[in-house]
Amino acid sequence: MESVLNFLTNINVIFTLLGYLIGGIPFGYALMKIFYGMDITKIGSGGIGATNVLRALQSKGVSNAKQMALLVLILDLFKGMFAVFLSKLFGLDYSLQWMVAIASILGHCYSPFLNFNGGKGVSTIMGSVVLLIPIESLIGLTVWFFVGKVLKISSLASILGVGTATVLIFFVPYMHIPDSVNILKEVGTQTPMVLIFIFTLIKHAGNIFNLLAGKEKKVL
C-alpha cells in the first residue's frame, strides 16, 4: 500500500497525469455543444479538432465557422503548451517535460472526458513541443500554416508540419543553441519527437491513403 501511495504522490506521476487531463479538455466538443447544440463526435470524421469543427459548421451554413475553428485550434494548441509550461514552472527534468507533452497529446486523442475518443492531436502536438524545441517547432508551425493556407489540405499540412519539426531535430541540436532547448544534449536522443511523428502518421493513416488516391478533401 505504501509503495502505491508513493507512486501516486510522485511529482513526475502527478504532472504526467495532469498533462493527460489538461490535454483531454475537449474544447471543440464543448464549444460546439454550448454554442450550436451539435455533437461534433457524431459529425464528419468524429474528430474534435479544428478541421472537423470547420467542416461541420460550414455544412450548416454558419457564418462564423472559420472564426470558431480558429478558436478551437488556438485552445488545443495552448492546452499542450500550458501542460508543458507547468512542468517547467515546477522544475521537472527536461526528459520528464517530454513525458508531460506526450501525455497531453494522448489526452487530446483519447480524452477521458469523451470515453477516450478525441482528435488527431496536431494542434496539441505543436503546442506541447514549442517550449521544448522552439526553433524546430516554430519552423514546423510555419510549414503547417503555409501548406494549409496554400493547398488547403489539412492532413497534408499537419503531416508536413510535424514532419518538418522532426527532421530538424537531427540538425538544429548541433547548432549553437541553449542546452535547455537542445533535445540531444538534455535527453541524448531524438526518440520522443520521432515517436510523436510516427503517432501522427498512424492517426492520419486514412488521410494518407486518401491523399495517395487523390481523394482527400480540401478545407475551404
UniProtKB/Swiss-Prot annotation:
- Could you tell me which pathway this protein works in? Lipid metabolism; phospholipid metabolism
**What InterPro entries does this protein map onto?**
G3P_acylTferase_PlsY
Q: Does the keyword Lipid biosynthesis apply?
A: yes
Q: How does it sit in the membrane?
A: Multi-pass membrane protein
Task: Please state the span of the N-terminal signal peptide per the UniProt entry.
Answer: none
Q: Where in the cell is it found?
A: Cell inner membrane
One Pfam family of this chain:
G3P_acyltransf
Q: What is this protein called?
A: Glycerol-3-phosphate acyltransferase
Q: Which organism is it from?
A: Helicobacter pylori (strain ATCC 700392 / 26695)
- Gene from which the chain derives: plsY
